[in-house]
């Protein structure tokens, strides 16, 4: 059974650049390296179309940009000019009056072969310039993905960095009463839409993680009452056990090149970090202690590994070279630290911290300095990075009879967003950008 298939898109970059194209000194930009920034007022018009699809596309674009915390879509009721032809230069004064510093116009049309063509233009209203213009062709059922791609293009043009909207998240969906909760592996778009289940059994599943090429997921399952790490092919639905070891295997994660899986393997009462070469199926032991070493995460260059260990009496974060040498502790604050995950940018490690009766999500530099707590509460856990390294997703369990939910937060700690899902949700893992 085909669970997931890649969506083919034809992209014509700069196909819509016109005589209004902007020079390099156009003023609309956001410097996201300055910490907390003021969101950019941006007017996003309903894309022209013969049906309601154009307005739906622009609504998704607006939601993506607003959720980033870097853009503030202007209320449509304030619009003065009604865009009747997105190919024509807008009346910039009408947009400056309502302080829309950027303007997005576009259209969605249906081709004779049934495909959709979505096109957009991004304008700097104060400089009176077009900043970007692109068009995309795809099947009608993929219209939401086209909207995410357009949002990424706008984000990149204004901030100078890659966006993260055309991505997916694999997670554990949870349903049923607390005493008999069913946990399934599921996948969705990063905004919580297009949820699909990847497994359908009563066996507990935990810690799903994407491969670098986005085509595989590794996860832990208690199938047959035996905790093991599995590898699932998203396109075919085929899966296999990653190593038939006598003890528990858990906390799997791919190496950046996709050639290995790093995981924790329990043998003789101890849990240590191992790697398995997916081609030769040979394993290499990286740690050898009488403690519990788990939750390994590679640096983006594959040269180092962060992991958690209780070898010092309580859970702390350690860093080592990829061959297991040079192991050193990097967390020294109050409380215990767990679930370390290296930023795609290589500059930070995100973590879960338990201290003072609260579970917090935070980040630190890779040497342990500069620790910052982004959010705290009854139970926050399991951070995962957006592919641009600017946003984290995690799950939160509030006190009471409810269940866990997914949230996102940026590195300022101010832009926390609930990711709505049909069921309770935990253990998120963000994909790289899609092709």
Curated annotation (Swiss-Prot):
InterPro entries: 6-blade_b-propeller_TolB-like, PD40, Tol-Pal_TolB, TolB_N. It is found in: Periplasm. GO terms for cellular component: periplasmic space. GO terms for biological process: cell division; protein import. Gene3D superfamilies: TolB, C-terminal domain (2.120.10.30), TolB, N-terminal domain (3.40.50.10070). Keywords: Cell cycle, Cell division, Periplasm, Signal. It holds the Pfam family PD40. Residues 1-26 form the signal peptide. SUPFAM superfamilies: TolB, N-terminal domain, Tricorn protease N-terminal domain. Its main location: periplasm. The Tol-Pal system is composed of five core proteins: the inner membrane proteins TolA, TolQ and TolR, the periplasmic protein TolB and the outer membrane protein Pal. They form a network linking the inner and outer membranes and the peptidoglycan layer. Part of the Tol-Pal system, which plays a role in outer membrane invagination during cell division and is important for maintaining outer membrane integrity. Belongs to the TolB family. NCBIfam families: propeller_TolB (TIGR02800). This is Tol-Pal system protein TolB. It comes from Agrobacterium fabrum (strain C58 / ATCC 33970) (Agrobacterium tumefaciens (strain C58)).
